[in-house]
Amino acid sequence: MAFITNSQGGSKNETKGGPGALVLLPFTFVGRTVIDWVDNLGAATIFLFTALTKTFGRKQLFKIVEQIYYIGAKSITIIMLVSLFTGMVLGLQSYHALVKFGAQGALGSLVSLSLIMELGPVLTAIMITARAGSAITAEIGIQRISEQIDALHTMRINPLRYLVSPKIIAAIISFPLLTAVFDLVGIIGGYISGVVLLGVNAGVYLHSIQAYVDLRDIINGFIKVIVFAVIVSTVCCYQGYFAHMRKDSHGAQAVGLATTSAVVLSCVLILVSDYVVTSLLI
Amino acid sequence: MHTPLIEFKDVTKRFGNRTVLERVNLQIYEGQVTTIIGLSGAGKSLILKHIIGLIQPDEGAIFFRGKPIAGMKKTEIATSFAQMSYMFQGNALFDSLTVYDNIALPLRETTNLKKAEIDRRVMARIEQTELTEAAHRYPSELSGGMQKRAALARALITDPQIVLFDEPTSGQDPVRKNAILSMIAQYQRKFNFTAILVSHEIPDVYFISNRILALYDRRIVFQGTPEELENFDHPFTDEVINSMEALQKELTGLYSKRQFKIFNHVQMRRSKSGEFYCIVFFSLQELNTIITKFGHDAAQDVLRDMGLYIDKHFGAIGGFSTRRDTNELITMLPYANLSEAESIIKDFVHDFHGQVTRTIQAAACKSVLGEPTELTIMAGIAQGQSTSNIDAVIALAKSQQKEIGRLHCAAGE
C-alpha cells in the first residue's frame, strides 16, 4: 500500500520507508484488517445465499435428513446434560436471591424465562458449535485440501449443493428443536433444585411458568436461535470450504486453524448477534 | 490436420509473482492418448486443471473443438465439461464413502438412472478393475494400488469421452505402474475415449501414447510422437528424459529405446566396417488373453520375468536389450554372426524350457479360474552389418519369428 501525498511529483520511495511509514503502520494494520473483514463478510454472505439457492433439488431431502441426524439427533445427549445442570444451577442461584425478597414463588417464571429467552438459544448454539460446527469445518476443510471438492467439480456435482446446503438447512431445522429440548430439560432442572431439593411448592413453580411465560417469549427465543443457526452453519462451512486460501498456513495446519477460527468466530458472533436481535425484539 | 479437440493458445498462468505457464501452445487430438511429460513442479497438472476448468488462464485462450471456452455460453461450457472426467494424482476418493459408493457417486448425483442400473454399471466397473473384494471397504483400508484402481473406476463410470489422468501411476511398484498404464491403454481402445496423461513413467508411457507433449521451462517445447521425441535435440532431452530413464527401467530391467539406440550407435562406431551383429526379436503372444483372464498384474509379471531373464542371459555375453512395445522385446548381440546367434538362442531356449518356463508360468497363471489358456513366446533372429540400417534388421528379425515356448495355464496347475 502506497501513501503518496505529494501529487506534484513526490517520490514513491519517500513513502515506503522512514518514520512516516512507521507512524502509519497501526493505521495500515487496522485498515487492512477492516478490509479483510468486509471482504470476508461479503464473501460469506454470497456463499450463504448461493448455498440457499441450492436447497431445492433432487435427492437433497435425504442429505438434509442425514445432516439433521448428525447435527441434531447426535447432539441431544450433550444438550440435555448441559441444560439439566444449567437449569439446576439457575434454580439454586435464583432461589437464594428470591428468598431475600420473599419472592421464591416466582422461581418457575424466572428459570423458564431465562432459559427460553436467553440461555436456551445461546447455550444450545454454543454447544452445537463446539460439537458439530467444529466437525463440519474440519470435514469440509479436509475435503478441500485432499481435492475431494475439486473432484466434485470435475464430476459436475455442485459442492455447495452436495456439501454445504444440506448442512445449513439441517442447522436451521435442528437448532430450534434442540433449543426446545434445552428449555424443557432446563426447566426440569430448575424444578429438581427448586422443588425437590429446596422445597418450593411444585404447584407454585409450574403455575408461575404458566402465568408469566408468553408465546411471544418462546417465538423470540426461536427467532434468535434461527439467526444463530444461520451464523454458525455459514461460518463453519465457509471456514472449511476456503481453508486452502488461508494466508497464515497450509494443508493440515490450515484445517486446524480454520476449525479454531470457526469455533471462536461463531461464539463471538452468537453473542454479538444475541444483543442485536434482543434489542430488535424487545 | 483436423481441428484439435483441445487447443491452448499463448496460455499464461501466474501465482503471485511466479509464472508457472508462459505462452503455452499445445494441441490435443480426439481419440488419441496424449501424455504430458516434464519435471516435478513444472506445471503439468496445472495444464490438466486448465483443461477441465478448475483453473482459468491469466492470459491466452483455451479452445474446445475449435471454439474458445471463454466465449462459450454457460450451457455450452457445461456440455463440454460434462464429456470430461478427471483422475486425480492423490485419487481424491471420498474417505467417508465405500469404494462402491465412491464409484456410484457421479451416477447417483448427475443422472436419473434407477438404483438397479447404477448397481449393474458400478459392479461391472468394479469387476473390470479387480476390486470386487474391496467394494464395501473404505479407501483408507485399501492399498495405494487399489485406491488408484478405485479412482480409475470412478473416472470411467460415466463413460466420458475425454479422461484426464494426473500421474495415475505415482507411488506404485514397477509391476503395478505398468499394469495401470496397460489398463488405461486397454480401456482407451475399448471405450475409444481421448486420454490425456501427466506421467513420469518414461519410457513405459511411450508404449501407450500416440503423442507426447514436453513441458520445459514453463513452455511446451515438443509435441509429437514418441518416435519423434527420440530424435528431439533440446536441453529437455538431457535434463529430463535422461534423468527419468535412469530411474525407469525397473520393470523389465532393460534399457529404454533411446538408451538402446545410443548403445547401438557406440557399438557401430567401435566396430570395423562390415562387422556383423545380430538382432533377436522376442514377442509374447496372447498377452491380452492373460490380461483379460488373469488381470494386468499377471501380464506385467510375465513381462518383468521375461525381461529379467533376457537381460541376465544376454547381458552376460555382451548383449543389450530393450522393450520395443507392450509385448515385444529386442536384444542386440554385437559381433555375433547368424550361426553364433543361433547357437546362443539354442542355449537360451534350453534354459528357458527348464527353470524359466516355470517362473513365467507361475506369474502368468496366477489364480487360474475357468477355461485353460496358453501364452506363446516367439523369437526371430536377423543378421546385420555395421553399415546396415538397424530398423530394417529389426523388421527382418520380427518377420522370422518362430515359437520357442508355450505356457499352458489351467486350474489346479
Model-derived features: positions:
Chain A
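Short, membrane-interfacial amphipathic segments enriched in basic
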Residues: 15-64, 244-249
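Active-site cofactor/substrate anionic-group-binding motifs, chiefly glycine-
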Residues: 67, 71-123
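Selective transmembrane-helix segments that form parts of the transport pathway or gating/packing helices
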Residues: 72, 76, 80, 119, ...
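Hydrophobic alpha-helical transmembrane segments that constitute the membrane-spanning cores
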Residues: 82-85, 125, 165-194, 235, ...
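Membrane-interfacial helix-loop-helix connectors in multipass membrane proteins
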Residues: 93-116, 185-226, 230, 234-254, ...
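Hydrophobic alpha-helical transmembrane segments of multi-pass membrane transport proteins
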Residues: 107-150
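Short cytoplasmic-facing helical segments at TM-TM junctions of multi-pass membrane proteins
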Residues: 140-165, 251-255
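Final/C-terminal transmembrane alpha-helix of multipass membrane proteins
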Residues: 255, 260-277
